[in-house]
Swiss-Prot record:
PANTHER family given in the database record: 50S RIBOSOMAL PROTEIN L4, LARGE RIBOSOMAL SUBUNIT PROTEIN UL4M
Protein family (similarity comment): Belongs to the universal ribosomal protein uL4 family.
Subunit structure: Part of the 50S ribosomal subunit.
Keywords: Ribonucleoprotein, Ribosomal protein, RNA-binding, rRNA-binding
GO MF, one annotated term: rRNA binding
Entries under InterPro entries matching the protein: Ribosomal_uL4, Ribosomal_uL4-like, Ribosomal_uL4_dom_sf
One BP term from GO: translation
Pfam families (UniProt xref): Ribosomal_L4
Organism placement in taxonomy: Bacteria, Pseudomonadati, Pseudomonadota, Alphaproteobacteria, Hyphomicrobiales
Name this polypeptide is given: Large ribosomal subunit protein uL4
Gene Ontology CC terms: ribonucleoprotein complex; ribosome
Function of the protein: One of the primary rRNA binding proteins, this protein initially binds near the 5'-end of the 23S rRNA. It is important during the early stages of 50S assembly. It makes multiple contacts with different domains of the 23S rRNA in the assembled 50S subunit and ribosome.
Length: 206
C-alpha cells in the first residue's frame, strides 16, 4: 500500500510504499488482546498483601469452654469469622506476568499496525526534528496536522529537541522504534511514524 508523506509543517514530501505484510493484514482482535493482556500483566506491581490467620498476633487460648455455653465450638480468635482475624485466601505478593511466545508478540504488533492503517489513523512524516525545543512551536505543528492524541515513533534515536518539546503536551507520546508496542499504539488515536521508523519496521519484519 502507498501512503503520502508530510512534513511537520504539513507540506507534502512525496509518498512511501508500505509492506502489506506489516500494514495490510486483516486485524485479528484475539492476537491484539492477548498481547495487551500480556503487557498489562507484566507491568502490574503485585504488591497487594493481606495477613492470614497464621500471621495475626492474638492469644492462642481457647475462647470459651467447648460445651455448655450454647455458642459454636471456637478454639481460636485468629480465624476469619472474627473482627481482627486473618483473611481467608487473601492476596499475596506475587508476579502476575505470564509467558507469551515471541512470534505471537511480533504478529500482534503487525496486526496493531494494520489496524491503525485500516482505520485511517496512520500518518507518515519525513522526520521528527525541531531547530528549537519549543513546546509552543510543536503544538502549532500538531494542530496543523490535526494531532491531539497521538503516538509518535521515530528511528533508533529520538531527536532531543523534539522529545523535550513534546513531553509537556498532554496525550502525546514519543518513542524510539525499539519501544514500539501494541498497547501504546492502541491507547492513542493516531500513530505517527517517521520514514526512519518505517524503514526500521520493514527491516525488522522482512
Amino acid at each position: 500500500m502507498e501512503l503520502n508523506v508530510t512534513t511537520l509543517e504539513g507540506n507534502a514530501a512525496g509518498s512511501v510504499q508500505l509492506s502489506d505484510g506489516i500494514f495490510g493484514l486483516e486485524p485479528r482482535k484475539d492476537l491484539i488482546q492477548r498481547c495487551v493482556n500480556w503487557q498489562l500483566a507484566k507491568r502490574q506491581a503485585g504488591t497487594h498483601k493481606t495477613k492470614g490467620r497464621a500471621e495475626i498476633w492474638r492469644t492462642g487460648k481457647k475462647m470459651f469452654k467447648q460445651k455448655g455455653t450454647g455458642n459454636a465450638r471456637h478454639g481460636s480468635a485468629r480465624v476469619p469469622q472474627f473482627r481482627g482475624g486473618g483473611r481467608a485466601f487473601g492476596p499475596v505478593v506475587r508476579s502476575h506476568a505470564h509467558d507469551l511466545p515471541k512470534k505471537v508478540r511480533a504478529l500482534a504488533l503487525r496486526h496493531a499496525l494494520s489496524a491503525k492503517a485500516k482505520d485511517g489513523g496512520l500518518i507518515v512524516i519525513d522526520s521528527a526534528e525541531l531547530n528549537e525545543a519549543k513546546t509552543k512551536a510543536l503544538v502549532g505543528h500538531f494542530s496543523g496536522l490535526g494531532l491531539t492524541n497521538a503516538l509518535i515513533v521515530d528511528g533508533a534515536a529520538v531527536h532531543a529537541g523534539f522529545a523535550t518539546a513534546a513531553r509537556n503536551i498532554p496525550n502525546i507520546d514519543v518513542l524510539p522504534i525499539q519501544g514500539i508496542n501494541v498497547y501504546d499504539i492502541l491507547r492513542r488515536r493516531k500513530l505517527v511514524l517517521t520514514k526512519a521508523a518505517v524503514d526500521a519496521l520493514e527491516a525488522r519484519f522482512k
